[in-house]
């Protein structure tokens, strides 16, 4: 569980006191060994119970667990930084050579994968895979780079026998959404979770009784609130990566895991279909 990442991504939903706690923890993460909830409460002018509730909101049992986890994350981060002569977590600049850019991009994608995988609730993921496996029909929605991730997932699911619709046109996406039925699944892919087209489709799907699964960020959003299930992704995009490269990396890690999980549920038949698909496409060469 990456608590520093959760704190950063959940800022939009913090109350005033929660924001005080978050700011203190991030500013003093290197000194947390000597910080108690009592000392922290006194310094911030809030109650100890507020600090405990904040820790529980992030998924920890209490402040002690959160504090120890943050200390561990900080130490691990320092070790990774010291292991490389280049500060590969830093932003790409116009002065960087192609070699440096390549290393920074690679590190950014590695971080997106590490942080996304650290957030997985595998029991929930297994439940999601089971829900998808029973769906008579699956719709996948997304815009821009997220649409590309969705299209890739749709091809993989069709290859193992699922009925899937993944249309790029937003009007068609909306039309398909309103025709979904109970038992059907809509997989909505949106890092921001606030794109009106995707939210509209999710609303329509829920109204029809379909199950909505959102692949989105940790931040509070309309899509996150609409979804029956969420799969969290983490990405550190900057102005130099406007095409959402690390976001797609994180999203692809989630969709690939869904695909492999679905193959495992019916491995013999799935592998037969994958083999038949490969044989057919070979004949087209």
Curated annotation (Swiss-Prot):
> Which part of the chain is the HTH rpiR-type domain?
1-77
Keywords associated with the record = Carbohydrate metabolism, DNA-binding, Repressor, Transcription, Transcription regulation
Annotated CDD domains: SIS_RpiR
Describe the location of the SIS domain by residue ranges: 128-268
The processes (GO biological process) annotated in the record are: carbohydrate derivative metabolic process; N-acetylmuramic acid catabolic process; negative regulation of DNA-templated transcription; regulation of carbohydrate catabolic process
A single GO molecular-function term is: carbohydrate derivative binding
Q: Where in the chain is the DNA-binding region found?
A: 37-56
Q: Which InterPro entries does this one have? A: Homeodomain-like_sf, HTH_RpiR, RpiR-like, RpiR-like_SIS, SIS_dom, SIS_dom_sf, Tscrpt_reg_HTH_MurR, WH-like_DNA-bd_sf
Task: Tell me the route in metabolism or biology where this protein functions.
Answer: Amino-sugar metabolism; N-acetylmuramate degradation [regulation]
> What function is annotated for this protein?
Represses the expression of the murPQ operon involved in the uptake and degradation of N-acetylmuramic acid (MurNAc). Binds to two adjacent inverted repeats within the operator region. MurNAc 6-phosphate, the substrate of MurQ, is the specific inducer that weakens binding of MurR to the operator.
Q: What subunit structure does UniProt give?
A: Homotetramer.
Indicate what this protein is called per its UniProt record: HTH-type transcriptional regulator MurR
């Amino acid at each position: 569980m990456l608590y520093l990442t959760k704190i950063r991504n959940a800022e939009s939903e913090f109350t005033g006191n929660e924001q005080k706690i978050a700011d203190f923890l991030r500013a003093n993460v290197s000194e947390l060994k000597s910080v108690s909830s009592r000392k922290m409460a006194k310094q911030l002018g809030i109650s100890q119970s507020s600090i405990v509730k904040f820790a529980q909101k992030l998924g920890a049992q209490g402040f002690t667990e959160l504090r120890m986890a943050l200390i561990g994350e900080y130490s691990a981060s320092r070790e990774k930084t010291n292991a490389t002569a280049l500060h590969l977590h830093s932003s790409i600049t116009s002065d960087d050579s192609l070699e440096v850019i390549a290393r920074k991009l690679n590190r950014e994608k590695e971080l997106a994968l590490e942080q996304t995988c650290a957030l997985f609730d595998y029991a929930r993921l297994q439940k999601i895979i089971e829900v998808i496996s029973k769906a008579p029909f699956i719709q996948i929605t997304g815009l821009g780079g997220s649409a590309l991730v969705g299209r890739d997932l749709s091809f993989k699911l069709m290859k193992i026998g699922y009925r899937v619709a993944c249309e790029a046109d937003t009007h068609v996406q909306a039309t398909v959404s309103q025709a979904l039925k109970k038992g059907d699944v809509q997989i909505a892919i949106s890092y921001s979770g606030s794109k009106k087209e995707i939210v509209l489709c999710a609303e329509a799907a829920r109204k029809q009784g379909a199950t909505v699964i959102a692949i989105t960020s940790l931040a509070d959003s309309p899509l996150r609130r609409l979804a029956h299930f969420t799969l969290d992704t983490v990405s550190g995009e900057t102005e130099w990566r406007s095409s959402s490269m690390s976001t797609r990396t994180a999203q692809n890690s989630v969709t690939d895991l869904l695909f492999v999980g679905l193959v495992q549920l019916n491995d013999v038949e799935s592998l037969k279909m994958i083999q038949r698909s490969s044989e057919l496409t070979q004949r087209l060469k």
